[in-house]
Structure formats: C-alpha cells, structure tokens
C-alpha cells in the first residue's frame, strides 16, 4: 500500500461494504493496539482480505509465531476449538468464547469429529461433567470444497449455527458457520 492521490473527496465518501450485500464492511487495516491486534484478529481480518498491524512492543519471536499461525490457517474455514471427549464442560465453557462461532468440536485422537458442544448443552450439568456425556453426536460434517451456497442452505435447513469441515480422510480441518459461508 502506497499513499497516493485519489479522486475521493472525503473519507466519508469511501464505501467499504462487501459485494455480497450482507451489510458488513471490511476493515482495511486493524490498529496496532495490544488489546485489538492479536493472533485471532489477524486470522479473521486476513481471511477477509484486510491487514493487521501488530503492536511494536511485542517480542519478535512472538510476532514470528503469529505470522506463522496466520499463514497456516484455512482461507475460508474458521479455526475450530477442539477438545477430547474426556475433557470437561468447564474446560469447554472457558474456551468457547474465544471464537465467534461459539462451538467446540469434540474429536478423537486422529482429529475425527465425534460431536459438537454449544453453551446451551451445558445447561443442567456441572462443570466437571465430561463432554461425551453432553455433546450432540448428530453431526452435519461438511466435506472440504463443498459449495458455499449449499453449506449455507444445509446449515439453515437443520437450524445449525456451525458445522465441522473434514477432509477426504474424515479429519477435521475447520469449522463453517452460516455467516462464514455467506461472507466467503
């Protein structure tokens, strides 16, 4: 990005809305503030085509790990939160708000989805209950490369907010939401 002359008379005349007509705008650059620009923000904004300026007071090795992390993320599917069936409701609840999709994918040792856990699934259970006792095992697994419009309709028809995405071997590679399918 190089500053140059443009025909835009005012910053108020700039339209950053996406071409998909869902009413969101794309941030071009995220500020280099410690509370704003981090690993998760960099991943999300990069997936949408924006830039993140990491704070200058972060050690170089941390910046390198953030950049490596972002470069290894899937360009369409969101990074899922994964836990084992023997992990607890408390562990899931402490992680579930780390991602906008609001789900934890319960996987086996080979990263194959076994179930899905939402905050609503925790109702009536104590925090030490293991996930295999409360997770939903009726999964809609999306195959990598599936048509995004079909994904949206499948999620809508089954009234799901998110679903795991698997590769040909059935291993988890991401998570997709209705909103994510629309935006991609």
Which stretches of residues belong to each language-model region?
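Bateman/CBS regulatory modules and CBS-like beta-alpha motifs in cytosolic regions of diverse proteins
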Residues: 9-33, 62-101, 106-109, 113-116, ...
């Amino acid at each position: 990005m190089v500053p140059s002359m443009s025909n835009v008379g005012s910053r108020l005349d700039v339209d950053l809305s996406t071409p998909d007509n869902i009413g969101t705008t794309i941030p071009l650059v995220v500020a280099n503030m410690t509370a704003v620009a981090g690993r998760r923000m960099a991943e999300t904004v990069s997936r949408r085509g924006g830039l993140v300026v990491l704070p200058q007071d972060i050690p170089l090795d941390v910046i390198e790990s953030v950049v490596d992390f972002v470069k290894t993320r899937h360009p369409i599917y969101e990074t899922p939160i994964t836990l084992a069936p023997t992990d607890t409701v408390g562990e899931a609840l402490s992680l579930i708000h780390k991602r906008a999709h609001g789900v934890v994918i319960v996987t086996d040792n080979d990263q194959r989805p076994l179930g899905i856990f939402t905050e609503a699934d925790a109702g009536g259970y104590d925090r030490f209950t293991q996930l295999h006792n409360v997770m939903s095992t009726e999964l809609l697994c999306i195959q990598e490369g599936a048509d995004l419009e079909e994904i949206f309709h499948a999620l809508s028809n089954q009234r799901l907010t998110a679903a795991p995405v698997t590769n040909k071997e059935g291993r988890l590679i991401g998570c997709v939401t209705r909103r994510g399918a629309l935006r991609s």
